[in-house]
């Protein structure tokens, strides 16, 4: 019997994300919520656990005992007790709970049994929560050499600790990574070159620039936008600097706003990761558009994990297929968002 049966059941109305680190919250989830505004999730409901999945497992076992998956786990209660998320227990209700963590086979606490237990238990975001594991890490969604990238099906990385550390550095040079980083590049330029020290002002200026459609941009338009945030003297230099940054971006070449382009890009990223997950469990990477929805709902993330474990277990060539399942929270929320 659970020690928490006396607690009144909560009517679930909100969404809660439990993620491993800053990149998941401040970059990936933030951007996905931005480009898919149909997803009704508040940024403040994304909780950074600040440790890996094995530490979360230990916290669950400490709170609920070895038979935690038979007793039942209340993640909202656990996050609140650990001081990760503060709310009025009686008033805040959740209808969607998502966990997003890295595979991290190189961790000293790594255990296939523990991972499989977690994946098996956390399988429903509308109930106890749904676990999305990224292989080898969250940055896997950036691992595309160009777009489209037919080679993604074969992209893999060794399970060796040092190579995994190098992986994060390698993906920083990809097209997707550069697109994701564009708002930061603009923000840093505004701060360092034009001394825009106030974070809120810098953020609003960056946002205004990213909302511009290339065909509408003239010297007059750029001057008008920038003049809201800096002196006339700085505008003269900044408009050329900002225009040069924007022109180098992929969205500019496609005559789209930044967020229009990123929405299309993430739709394709999600689809390619669905294709790859299907191929990992023995299916075909080539999935017809008309069959995509059915293939996704037939996908078993525990089976994906077991296949990845088996590949990594090989002594001579322990490899793991690069895969980001974290982006699947979009399709879980509403698969029609990806077309």
What does each model-found stretch correspond to?
Residues 46-72:
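Extended charged low-complexity segments that act as oligomerization/scaffolding linkers
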Residues 74-77:
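Short, flexible loop segments at the rims of nucleotide/cofactor-binding pockets, characterized by
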Residues 2-12, 26-47, 57-61, 79-339:
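C-terminal accessory helical subdomains adjacent to catalytic cores in phosphodiester-
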Residues 16-18:
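Conserved beta-strand elements of the Class I
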């Amino acid at each position: 019997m659970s020690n928490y049966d006396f607690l009144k059941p909560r009517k679930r109305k909100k969404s809660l994300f439990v993620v491993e680190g800053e990149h998941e919250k401040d970059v990936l989830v933030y951007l996905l919520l931005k480009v898919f505004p149909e997803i009704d999730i508040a940024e403040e409901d994304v909780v950074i656990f600040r440790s890996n999945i094995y530490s979360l497992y230990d916290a669950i076992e400490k709170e609920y005992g070895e038979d935690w998956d038979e007793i039942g786990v209340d993640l909202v209660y656990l996050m609140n007790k650990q001081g990760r998320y503060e709310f009025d227990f009686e008033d805040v209700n959740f209808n969607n709970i998502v966990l997003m963590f890295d595979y991290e086979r190189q961790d000293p606490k790594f255990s296939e049994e523990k991972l499989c237990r977690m994946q098996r238990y956390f399988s429903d975001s509308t109930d106890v929560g749904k676990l999305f594991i990224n292989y080898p890490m969250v940055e896997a969604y950036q691992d595309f050499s160009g777009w489209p990238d037919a080679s993604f099906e074969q992209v893999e990385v060794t399970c060796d600790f040092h190579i995994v550390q190098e992986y994060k550095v390698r993906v920083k040079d990809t097209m997707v990574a550069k697109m994701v980083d564009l708002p930061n590049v603009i923000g840093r330029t505004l701060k360092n070159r034009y001394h825009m020290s106030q974070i809120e002002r810098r953020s609003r200026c960056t946002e205004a620039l990213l909302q511009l459609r290339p065909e509408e941009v003239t010297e007059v338009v750029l001057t008008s936008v920038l003049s809201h945030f800096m002196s006339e003297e700085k505008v003269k230099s900044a408009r050329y600097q900002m225009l040069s940054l924007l022109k180098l971006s992929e969205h500019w070449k496609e005559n789209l706003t930044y967020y229009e382009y990123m929405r299309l890009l993430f739709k394709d990223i999600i689809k390619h990761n669905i294709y790859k997950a299907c191929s990992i469990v023995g299916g075909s990477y080539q999935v017809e558009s008309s069959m995509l929805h059915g293939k996704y709902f037939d996908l078993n993330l525990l089976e994906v994990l077991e296949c990845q474990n088996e590949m990594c277990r090989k002594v001579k060539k322990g490899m793991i297929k690069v895969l980001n399942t974290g982006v699947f929270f979009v399709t879980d929320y509403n698969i029609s968002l990806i077309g």
